[in-house]
Amino acid sequence: MNHKWNYRPITPEQAETSQTLAQELGISPILGQLLVQRGITKAAAAKKFFRPQLPALHDPFLMKDMDIAVERLNRAMGKKERILIYGDYDVDGTTAVALVYKFIQQFYSNLDYYIPDRYNEGYGISKKGVDYAAETGVGLIIVLDCGIKAVEEITYAKEKGIDFIICDHHVPDDVLPPAVAILNAKRLDNTYPYTHLSGCGVGFKFMQAFAISNGIEFHHLIPLLDIVAVSIASDIVPIMGENRILAYHGLKQLNSNPSIGMKAIIDVCGLSEKEITVSDIVFKIGPRINASGRIQNGKEAVDLLTEKDFSIALEKAGQINQYNETRKDLDKSMTEEANNIVANLEGLADRRSIVLYNEEWHKGVIGIVASRLTEVYYRPAVVLTRTDDMATGSARSVSGFDVYKAIEHCRDLLENFGGHTYAAGLSMKVENVNAFTKRFEEYVSQHILPEQTSAVIEIDAEIDFRDISSKFFSDLKKFNPFGPDNTKPIFCTHHVYDYGTSKVVGRDQEHIKLELVDNKSNNVMNGIAFGQSSHVRYIKTKRSFDICYTIEENTHKRGEVQLQIEDIKPIE
């Protein structure tokens, strides 16, 4: 794959600010530049960025309807009403339900939770779920990570005498559901200063407000932060602002004192002996929690996350791990099938989107397949399967393109849809699939930019190997946790060559272990280039080449720094 290297621009004014900032903080000007690229131009803001503080969290009562939500919850507890915590079946939804249930359960016992079945009920609030609430005497439902578009279902619940508090972060329609309170910073009448909370993050703010109203000290909320961090990392929300504070302290909690359920997941992931990062959550912890809702029922994930006995939690984590193995097998076979279909599509080179429909595909894995297609073909992708008489599916997007708007453009063809800029769910009548495919392609073709459909590596700064000192790496680590809006910095160095010891490694000989010399400084660095063994013949000629890379700690030799090489460009 030929990647285009895109160097992040920096103006003369920004360069000057970078130098000033670096001097004030006692860090490398290169790191000063990284701060400025992230919108941080003052030393005081940089210190808050490097050491996020929990007291800097926003007042939860700044959120529209928060006072109403807290009053209704307090009234329900005072009147001994039965409360149901209801949430989506993905990681964000199940962590949100676990968080709210665990916190309220410390003070109130007439409580239950409910996760809709992906296959029998589908996404969001279902009439079956409302009926369950009515049959079990529920007076108040707190719904998390869904509900913002459930006008019909919440009206149905209201007719049965059930009130709703919505805690959501998805984009609302013009007409809001008739809930008692709607906590969502994406409301048009939003009054909250941060709009990128995860669904679980909104649940946390609700519990923070509930704690304040009842004189419960903040330290009682800290044990919940490991769950919040998992939701933030898994739902791919920006890790800046309030999310950075929550993720930073949540990772500390995850590493030092995880909840019993999280500790069991950490054990089955084989992460007990290492410092857990956002990447570990995204690639190991999150997929296992998600597998429960994909393969069986998301309720099992909540059962695990709320478990108080570690031996039972380990058994439950083992079961969820098995679901993940099943998910991986389905993922592999469906992705292969999808790739074969796309490779044979007529006029693929001229298409700007991919829409696939196969009624045999497993509903729980189609979102993953859509993600794989965007990674390979650099186009927004929609993958659909059949559920009863409907085509239901998931959409994923490429960097910079709003797939939600593209789907919204086709709303008259849809029965239901919802989501974010980069991920959405949708359903339509099977007979509308062809019309949707055409209209979606038309919209994408008109709005996507050429650079959004090609493999691009965004390079933060050009450096020499001599810049990579132990202090530089120590200061660079302060940029953690990495994620959207604060991605792991990618550096490039021009004119490096093989020291003479570089070799191909890996079971299938697909990686290169490198020892490289920087032509400019003559400094030597070790590196690993995954999946790039095709370059080894050129490298062995001792001719110079350019590299772009992230800087990592060698997991096999603690304290040693190595380069994880993203791309190699021979110099012709």
Task: State each model region's role.
Residues 2, 10-140, 160-161, 211-435, ...:
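Hydrophobic helix-and-loop "lid/oligomerization" segment in the mid-to-C-terminal part
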Residues 75, 171-184, 516-521:
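Acidic-glycine-rich active-site phosphate/pyrophosphate-binding loop
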Residues 75-79, 312-318, 322-356, 409-572:
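Mid-to-C-terminal polyanion-binding domains and interfaces
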Residues 99, 175-216, 221-233:
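Short alpha-helices
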Residues 114, 144, 167-169, 183-185, ...:
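Generic beta-sheet signal
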Residues 119-121, 150, 170-175, 189-191, ...:
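Short gly/pro/ser/thr-enriched loop/turn and capping motifs at secondary-structure boundaries
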Residues 150-151, 235:
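Intrinsically disordered, low-complexity regulatory tails of plant transcription factors
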Residues 152-156, 369:
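A short acidic, amphipathic alpha-helical/loop segment
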